[in-house]
Structures are given as structure tokens and as C-alpha cells.
């Protein structure tokens, strides 16, 4: 029986998909030369004044609406004071006592069990710059391209009790952000970052234990591994009679360990106070109603609809709705006449593999949903076999070819003429007399062998159903 209960809360920083930064007109484009997207405002020069990007407010409010939050009609920016080389002003412009959104939730399912994870708050803030350390000349450089890029921080309640719940929560949160088109969810580029606050307490105890904050979690797998390690580390300390220190720890993926980075600060350490350069943000009720009406169908609702309308399994619906463009691709394929379950199977196997190998999103695939539907219908009609379809799929995907035209040009149509197949069946039986005798002696599993030989002889073009029928007659 477990001695301790794990308690986890998560802070997610999501970079918003605005064209310009939160308080200036500099571009937010990723991957440019260091300090290319910098101006006096985002570099913290004296005497400059920030101007709030209205789109940031809209995106933050829409995320709040999508997660059932109360969107406050008035919210206030505050200065979070601390020193770090990549923070040019000596403070971060964030929100503290009056955030834009509060009291929301996200529903997750782990191992068939549904659970609601509370969201404490969502607030707007600016990102910091980036330190670049050069071992060659023993210097550290500061790139301010990321400084002043708009973020929303989404703070959960400490409702999660294991790494599996955390990963499910993060995936659900990321899916909502992507569906809203307010964040691209790219963890590798830092558009979706998370910190996990992990603590243990004896089973049955109401009071929380001392927490450690885990950073450098840049993939869902790293989140899982880091929390597993941290839970074990804290349990060992408590078993030995020690006390867990409140601190920030950095996850090392290569070693699969966490190491102390610094003491964990409390809110009072940052000396928050309202930013005098920014007026309170006011959202009119009519504006909020407009934004609410613009919300798209969200992942949870679409998942339920896929199960109800298309007869998909919960698993298939979850996979297809995890990414908005995959869900839209699926619906377009079904609208073009593809059987829903068969389209789902082809998307999860062949299409997803090719997309991952090519590094492209479904919306950018040369093989359109209509062409995938055409392929599925060719199989259903008996024009080609599933085996042939799998063989030609890479070419169809890479070149965006029309399946019917490709099959006709290559002469790949399935052989469904019984007279044409009968000679192939007789040839295979004549070439394998021992197997024929064994089959007639009761080894009926050899049917698969005969079918395989005929498919080989016809280069996979024989109609499997007709082959079975002819074999039964010949061997009966």
C-alpha cells in the first residue's frame, strides 16, 4: 500500500500567436538573428511607454471562456520585480491580484476514469529574453528577440495525483489552445512550456507537503519521467526522516534526474505592485459575448460527436481530435464519401506515419482528404486490395496523386475475373502437391499458405475473397 500521496499543480506558459509583441510593434517571428526584433520598449530603455496589444486580451479571454473561467471585466497589470540578465527592465510585466481569468477547469480521462482539474487563474504577461552561453570564449550573450513576446500563464489547482494525470491535463490544455488558434503548441520552440510543482504527503493527511518546482520539461515524455523521478526522490528523503526543501529543480533528460537550481521564491519575494504605465484592462459585456460566439467546437465536444455521429471508438475519436487539422481532414474525407471507420484507420496508420516522416501537418499534405476518400472507395468497391493500397500510399502521399488515375496507369486493378484467377489457383495447387494432400488430411491452416502463393503469383492483385472461394471448390 502506498505510504504517500502525490500532489501536483502545473503552471503552463503559452506563447500567443500574435504578429507583434505585447507592448510594442516588434515582430514575434521565431528563428531570426539575435536581437533582430528589438526596439527601445522591449529592450527596456528609459523613458519609453508600453502600449497593450488588444489581440493579446482577446486571446487570453477566449482561452478563459474555453476552460469555463470567469473572465473579469477589469484586470490589472503588475510589475514582478527580480534581477536576471535576460530581463532588461529589472521587472516582468505580469498580472497578480487581478488577473484576466479565474476559476476554470479542464476535464481529463486517465485509464477510463474521468476527472476535473481546476484552473486557478489565467493571466497575461511578457516573456523574458534568452541567455546564450558560449563555452568557446567563456561569455554569455543576451538575445532579446523573445523579450516582450506575449504569454498567458495558466495555473492549475493542485488536483493531479500522478504523472499520467499531468500529461493528460497538458495534452488537453494544448489541444484547446491549438483549436482556438491562439497558440501553436510547439514545445520544441518553447511556445508551450510547463513547470510542475510536486509534493508528497502521508496518505490521509489534509495538509500539503513541501513542494519542489520542476523546470526544463520540454516534452510530454520529459514531464512524465521528471515527475516519476521527483516522487521517488522525495519519498526517499521522507523515509529517511529528512525534510524536503522548497526549491526549483532542473530536469536533466540525459541522466533522468532533477538537480537543485535555486531556492523557490514566494510571491512576496517579487514585490508585486500595479504597473503605473498601464491602465486597467476593461472588457465590455458585449465584447465578451462576441468572443464567446466566435469560439470553435472544442476537442471534448468534437470527440463526443465523432463517437455519436460516426460510430468511432473513444480511442479513435481521441486520436483524431488531438490536433484540429487532423479532425478537419477526417471530416472532409467522410464528407467526400469515405466510410468513417475505414477513413479513421487509414489516417491513424498510413497517413499519420507519412505526416510524421515528412514533418508536415495534415492541412499541408499533398494527399487531400478527397483523395484519401477516393482510395478508401477503391478498396470498398473491390477495384484494388488493401495490400496494393498500402504499397502505393507513399507515392500518393508524396506526389498528391489521384488514386484512381494512378491505379489505372499502373495497371494495379484487382483481378476479379474467376476465369483469369482459376489458372493461377490450379498452377499453385499443382506446384504444391504435398501441401494439398496435407490440407485434405485436416491441416486446414494451409489455406493461408495457398492464398499467399496466389497473391504472390498475381503480384497482390488477386481478389482475396474470390481466391478463397476458388480454393474451397478445388480443395473441397
From Swiss-Prot:
Entry-linked SMART domains: GatB_Yqey (SM00845)
Family under the similarity heading: Belongs to the GatB/GatE family. GatB subfamily.
Keywords assigned: ATP-binding, Ligase, Nucleotide-binding, Protein biosynthesis
Subunit structure: Heterotrimer of A, B and C subunits.
Keyword Ligase belongs to the record: yes
Protein name: Aspartyl/glutamyl-tRNA(Asn/Gln) amidotransferase subunit B
Gene3D superfamilies given in the database record: 1.10.10.410, GatB domain, N-terminal subdomain
Gene name for this UniProt entry: gatB
GO biological process, one term: translation
Reactions the enzyme catalyzes: L-glutamyl-tRNA(Gln) + L-glutamine + ATP + H2O = L-glutaminyl-tRNA(Gln) + L-glutamate + ADP + phosphate + H(+); L-aspartyl-tRNA(Asn) + L-glutamine + ATP + H2O = L-asparaginyl-tRNA(Asn) + L-glutamate + ADP + phosphate + 2 H(+)
EC category name: ligase
EC number(s) stated in the UniProt entry for this protein: 6.3.5.-
Free-text function comment from the UniProt entry: Allows the formation of correctly charged Asn-tRNA(Asn) or Gln-tRNA(Gln) through the transamidation of misacylated Asp-tRNA(Asn) or Glu-tRNA(Gln) in organisms which lack either or both of asparaginyl-tRNA or glutaminyl-tRNA synthetases. The reaction takes place in the presence of glutamine and ATP through an activated phospho-Asp-tRNA(Asn) or phospho-Glu-tRNA(Gln).
GO molecular function: asparaginyl-tRNA synthase (glutamine-hydrolyzing) activity; ATP binding; glutaminyl-tRNA synthase (glutamine-hydrolyzing) activity
Ion transport among keywords: no
